[in-house]
């Protein structure tokens, strides 16, 4: 989370905290929740074999969002600012990491 949030904040953007990445295993959406905001060296320990997504929502304005009550899926920024989201799936290996999907 520290890398994502520090990069976004350095460039004048905010990071949504209500949504984040997740573990991938037998089921697609599994624990742990991957928060995209944090302090360096304070997050969970990454160990070989872990597979998870990194999928931050980055906003041009404030970080606050709401979900459309009509479809319970579409997310909007509360201040009407623009937002972008992308997803990577990452495998932790014995020697580092491997990006499985972009």
Residue ranges and their predicted role:
Residues 1-102:
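Active-site neighborhoods and metal-handling regions in enzymes and metal-associated proteins
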């Amino acid at each position: 989370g520290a890398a994502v949030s520090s990069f976004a904040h350095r460039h004048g953007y905010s990071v949504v905290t209500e949504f984040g990445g997740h573990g991938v295993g037998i089921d697609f959406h599994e624990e742990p929740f991957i928060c995209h905001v944090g302090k360096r060296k304070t997050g969970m320990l990454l160990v070989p074999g872990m597979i998870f997504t990194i999928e931050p929502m980055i906003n041009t304005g404030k970080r606050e969002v709401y979900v459309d009550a009509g479809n319970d899926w579409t997310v909007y920024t509360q201040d009407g600012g623009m937002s972008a989201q992308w997803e990577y799936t990452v495998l932790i290996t014995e020697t580092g990491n491997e990006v499985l999907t972009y």
